[in-house]
Amino acid sequence: MFEEVLQESFDEREKKVLKFWQEGQLFERSVENRKGQPLFTFYDGPPFATGLPHYGHILAGTIKDVVLRYKTMKGFCAPRRFGWDCHGLPVENEIEKTFGLSGAKSIEEFGIAKFNEECRNIVLRYTEEWKFTVNRMGRWVDFNQTYRTMDLPFMESVWWVFKQLYAKGLVYEGLKVMPFSAKLGTPLSNFEASENYKEVDDPSLTVAFQSRDNSNTYFLAWTTTPWTLVSNLALMVSPMIEYAEVQDHVSKRNYILATERLKGYYKDSGEYTIVRKFPGSELEGQHYIPLFDYFNDRAHSGAFKIILEDSISVEEGTGIVQTAPAFGEIDFYACQKAGIDPVCPVDNNGQFTDEIPEYKGIFVKEADKDIIKRLKQQAKVIHQGTCHHRYPFCPRSDTPLIYKTVRTWFVAVEKIKDRLLAANSQIHWTPEHIQYGRFGKWLEGARDWAISRNRYWGTPIPLWRAQDGEIHVVGSIEELKQLTGNPLTDLHRHFIDEMSFEKNGKTFKRIPEVFDCWFESGSMPYAQNHYPFENRELFEQNFPADFIAEGLDQTRGWFYTLTVLSAALFDQPAMKNVIVNGLILAENGAKMSKRLKNYPDPAEVIQQYGADAIRLYMLHSPAVKADDLSFSKSGVELVLRQILLPLWNAYTFFLTYARIYNWKPGKLVQKPELAIDQWIISLLNKLVHEVEQGMDDYDLSRSVEPFVNFVDQLTNWYIRRSRRRFWDDKESPNRTQAFETLYYVLIELTKISAPYVPFISEAIYQNLRSCDMPESVHLCDFPHYQQLSRHEKLEAEMEAVQVTVSLGHALRKEHKLKVRQPLATAQLASADPKVLDFLKEQQHLISEELNVKEITFSSNEKDFVSLKAKPNFRVLGKKVGKLMKLAQLTIEQFGQKELTELLNHRSVEIILEGHPVLLTSEDVQVERIVREGIIAANQGTITIALNTNLNKELLLEGLAREIVNKVNTMRREANFAVTDRIQLYMQTTTRVIECFDQYKNYICQEVLATDVQFGPYEGTDWDLNGEPTKIIIKKSEY
């Protein structure tokens, strides 16, 4: 029944599984089989196909795949439609580089139609590479029904979304200070600007503004953007800060600044004399002489005066802030409140206009040095330095952003903030702290969303404007056809920009802007189904999504735009459950960089270790809890070596002996009688329960960890403890039950592991399944939890045994005693009678594992350990607060009476400053400290002591076990079959020969030796516990 396992790499084996899936159309069938079952809706965030997939995509894709495979196995119909983000700056950047274009002027000279068609040509450049990587990683998605944001139906639905918002009064055109990419010539939204902060050094300048009322008095103002000084229209002070007028002893001038900031400008108070102190409110309305004369005429309309602003700080600077309202959001609102209109002498390339003739055509930041130089010549610079701070860079062009006033179209997010917060309260987040932490706080501080971009390759904003300012919003292709009388085959700019129409005697022309591509991706739930023009019922069944998953950065991206639009349109969230993954960094913790090549090529890692190893490495990492993961090949290799190889070896172990004895599974599996079989089946059911709990709560770490632990228990305990049952040459109920149990466990385990490691699960299942089972493990139902098969008492017993064995092995290691060396006695102590009973019941097993001849038991642990109490600071701190130090001193003085009460889970009362406080075992930890002079170890209620004295008999037996170990190592290295008999030739010492005299039968039985010869042989050199030996093994002919 069972095929022989070939020697091949994980990569080779996985490729065979891929072929099996593709030829059998297993993905399609897995969805088809569940039709008519409850629908599980998933939205896939669309990636750009202009770049290759990286580890971040692989992580998010793996998380999505795990959940959807699991839900399918749980009986849901879970379609998986892939999508492509086709519009936006990443695509435009590629074309600009290809054709040497830079900025709007060069693009328009090139031709918008040609430019857009070039964008269309490259937008799906890497789709085949994406498909290959997605498939090779084992992710099942539907590439045959992909949605694309550049397709006509998708774009039409985006228009519908916009018109709905406009009709609800949630769209307006306004002048605001926005993050602005001079390189791209367009404003960005606040969440885009938050994506790419860098540590930079900018000039720090303190400038003296001369008072118009007193020529010897100067207001000292601070700035880190000297280029904005040419547009200065006001100075801001705080009404709540105290200011001082001081006479400077060197310049003889009077300076005004915050009292608290004097120390930042004077080393010694003897350098100045305080003339007066006063609140900032007294400065309101005072006038000063502008530094430059570019906008002197603005003095007549209220400029060049001091205004009030509560947000001014005295942490740095002077407590007075120079104000250029066109280039700062706070400045803009403060001046607006004071009736001062902004001036913006900076164009869309970030260059000064002819309003500043000396710097016309110069990028603003490049003018800093000359502006500072001019002010120094005028003796206006009081202090010049450098400010090291975080500054936003354009996430697309990686150039520094500026902030400037722009006229743009907004979604009035602030107006519906309460609806966003209500929608968020209905979403289940993993990890849960995202809900009211990173995402919730972002919603609380949400600003109106700038959705228009002065670009070309995107969905045009469907606004037509008459010369008098009247607006007409178009919400469909049919509406535009009726208005213009023109047929429509495409909605991109070069098809509709020139379309105008007459209405009420007015000519309406389209505005030139396109949508922010985040508006398109936020419209995806509607646009992917061309809602509401088609598929109404399909949309209503699929909204909101049951599940989505993306990276932490999407809390300010896709998660945000989905929520804004769904709350605005339908007063509900767009998704019910969200898994947020962390970022994948280079091994040194730095951001992954193609330029620096600081990370391994995913294709190479897949080829070396296989996709399952990468999947499990990521799933069994902090990344599934929104924490960062520093990716390392060694981490992937460790998962392969410690989890997947042991799992595969467990399967091949079973297969080897099943083939040797021609064992076949019966129709009925007998209920296991042996405790170890009952134990592993109980653990298997516990695993089913824990995986279900974690997966149903979308907590992958809670479901993956038990799987990893189970593989360890199966391979390092169950199979190791059961090996001899499989080696039995004669058929017996014991051997049959061992085969039945391991076969059942492996089959069920492949179903549990299938969502996590789909390739190895399929490979094992394919060779173990009988003809009446589903064709693929991925067509199976997820195992059902069987409460009747749980033996929690047995699980607790075995856990106590494993703790004991682990402590014993640690003691042996500490005292350099191999486990192969028998010891005379071990003593086990526990004050917990249940634990002691567990250990007594498993005495034989413990004796074998620890390789000791005799075990004694004691309930008096005080012979081995002393008890000491210490506070559980995390828990107790909430109860006693500032009295923690006093509580700690009291607890550390506890005697036997209090310790006994706590160990028996009873409370203890203490008095703190006259007040009684009741302490429980949660408040206080009782530590067991091994007494001096005893070779012992402790964990929890279990203590073990070893007798490490070795007599001759023990040493000889240990030597016999060492011989068996080395000969079996030679058998494995020679690739002998497990049934091959051997002849043994040895050149050794009299002590080893003496060992054979006593233990020959044992040694020969363990290594399958038919004959042993001693003599002057040249063989493999071994050190057998200090006895130099040469060994030769040969296959026996009989």
UniProtKB/Swiss-Prot annotation:
CDD domains: Anticodon_Ia_Ile_ABEc, IleRS_core. GO terms for biological process: isoleucyl-tRNA aminoacylation. The keyword Thylakoid does not apply. InterPro entries: aa-tRNA-synth_I_CS (IPR001412), aa-tRNA-synth_Ia (IPR002300), Anticodon_Ile_ABEc (IPR033709), Ile-tRNA-ligase (IPR002301), Ile-tRNA-ligase_type2 (IPR023586), M/V/L/I-tRNA-synth_anticd-bd (IPR013155), Rossmann-like_a/b/a_fold (IPR014729), tRNAsynth_Ia_anticodon-bd (IPR009080). GO terms for molecular function: aminoacyl-tRNA deacylase activity; ATP binding; isoleucine-tRNA ligase activity; tRNA binding; zinc ion binding. Its EC number is 6.1.1.5. Keywords: Aminoacyl-tRNA synthetase, ATP-binding, Cytoplasm, Ligase, Metal-binding, Nucleotide-binding, Protein biosynthesis, Zinc. The keyword Transcription does not apply. Its cofactor is Zn(2+). It catalyses: tRNA(Ile) + L-isoleucine + ATP = L-isoleucyl-tRNA(Ile) + AMP + diphosphate. It is found in: Cytoplasm. A motif ('HIGH' region) lies at residues 47-57. ATP binds at K594. A motif ('KMSKS' region) lies at residues 591-595. GO terms for cellular component: cytoplasm. NCBIfam families: ileS. IleRS has two distinct active sites: one for aminoacylation and one for editing. The misactivated valine is translocated from the active site to the editing site, which sterically excludes the correctly activated isoleucine. The single editing site contains two valyl binding pockets, one specific for each substrate (Val-AMP or Val-tRNA(Ile)). Catalyzes the attachment of isoleucine to tRNA(Ile). As IleRS can inadvertently accommodate and process structurally similar amino acids such as valine, to avoid such errors it has two additional distinct tRNA(Ile)-dependent editing activities. One activity is designated as 'pretransfer' editing and involves the hydrolysis of activated Val-AMP. The other activity is designated 'posttransfer' editing and involves deacylation of mischarged Val-tRNA(Ile). Monomer. Belongs to the class-I aminoacyl-tRNA synthetase family. IleS type 2 subfamily. This is Isoleucine--tRNA ligase.
